[in-house]
Each structure stands twice: as structure tokens, then as C-alpha cells.
Amino acid sequence: MFITFEGIDGSGKTTQSHLLAEYLSEIYGVNNVVLTREPGGTLLNESVRNLLFKAQGLDSLSELLFFIAMRREHFVKIIKPSLMQKKIVICDRFIDSTIAYQGYGQGIDCSLIDQLNDLVIDVYPDITFIIDVDINESLSRSCKNGYEFADMEFYYRVRDGFYDIAKKNPHRCHVITDKSETYDIDDINFVHLEVIKVLQMV
């Protein structure tokens, strides 16, 4: 099974991907669950990730092509081999983030992004959890974590992108709304339990 978590920065998707990995590891064994992320996932990609996040003046198309190349590396080295071994793969960000951020957010033609994704992968997620959160709350969380962020209009476009992706892929995508303002342990557990409920129905 291939599971992905998506959402805007500060949505809590990384926390949820880790919680799900721990939960499934207790059931199926730690050796049968693979937790990974994009951009990243391999030693090479993690190095490139660090460089990209520090890059100044990189245009949106160049950034997209970097992400697509990294996805290919990640897919052939980590994701597909793990799936071939019947392992459960949980990925923090995947194709939908590219469509939402580079497509809806930065204005690159989504059909081009789809073509590039089709070029570098041949297996798609079985289930995608889109963790939705208020823009102001997400930016507040991101600031607390020391992350830089773009203008709010950009994040509204990205959030709308995730909504559209979910509407176009209702059998794969499940939107879970985090309405919390404090993001304490109860809020985190609420989202986690919603994730588990969805998994129990598939």
C-alpha cells in the first residue's frame, strides 16, 4: 500500500505521517513500513533539498525540474522497490504537492506537471490524506518552527489547489480538516484518529 500526506506548510502532515508509521509498525512490524518524504528520501535528494531551500533567485520552472528529477531518484531507489517487497510506504508530500505549489501556486501549467510525473513514476498513491488547516494558523505554526513563508495569497492558491485535487480524485484523496487553534496533543490525536478511520474503511 502506498499512502501519501499532503497539505500546506504548517498543516501537521509531517506529524501525522510519523504517527501513522508508528501505528502501522506496531501492527505489521517496523520492517514492513517505510516512512519517507519529498523533497528528499535518499542521501542525494536530502543534500539537494538543503541546497534548494537555500537557493536565491531560482525561477519556478527550474525548481519544478529539480523536484521532478528528485522524484525519479526517490521513486526508483526507495518507493517502488519497497512496494515490490509488499511494504507499506508512507510519504510526506508527493505528486499533489507539486501540482498545488508549482501549478496552482506558481502558475505552471498543471498538464505539464502531470506529463512530467507520468514520465518519472508508474505507480500512484492508493490513499492520499490532505490535512487542511486555516492559512493564518498554518503560518503561525510555520513561524514557530523557524520556517520562512511566501505571501498569504500564494498559500490561498495552494490550498485551493489541494481542494481541486481532492475533488478530481475523490476515491484516492481524503481531506481531513484540522480546526484547532492551539495544536495541542488532543488536536493531533483527533486528526490521527480520523486517518485511522479512513484506513479501516478501505
UniProtKB/Swiss-Prot annotation:
- What GO CC annotations are associated with the protein? cytosol
Pfam families documented for this protein = Thymidylate_kin
Q: Which UniProt keywords apply?
A: ATP-binding, Kinase, Nucleotide biosynthesis, Nucleotide-binding, Transferase
One biological-process term from Gene Ontology? dTDP biosynthetic process
Catalytic reactions on record: dTMP + ATP = dTDP + ADP
Q: Which residues does the annotation say bind ATP?
A: 7-14
**CDD domains, per this entry?**
TMPK (cd01672)
InterPro entries, per database record: P-loop_NTPase (IPR027417), Thymidylate_kin-like_dom (IPR039430), Thymidylate_kin_CS (IPR018095), Thymidylate_kinase (IPR018094)
**Per UniProt, what is one GO molecular function of this protein?**
dTMP kinase activity
Q: Does the keyword Kinase apply?
A: yes
EC number(s) for this protein?
2.7.4.9
NCBIfam families the UniProt entry points to: DTMP_kinase
* PANTHER family associated with the record: THYMIDYLATE KINASE (PTHR10344), UMP-CMP KINASE 2, MITOCHONDRIAL (PTHR10344:SF4)
Q: Which family does the entry's similarity section mention?
A: Belongs to the thymidylate kinase family.
State the protein's purpose.
Answer: Phosphorylation of dTMP to form dTDP in both de novo and salvage pathways of dTTP synthesis.
Q: What is this protein called?
A: Thymidylate kinase
Q: Which organism is it from?
A: Ehrlichia chaffeensis (strain ATCC CRL-10679 / Arkansas)
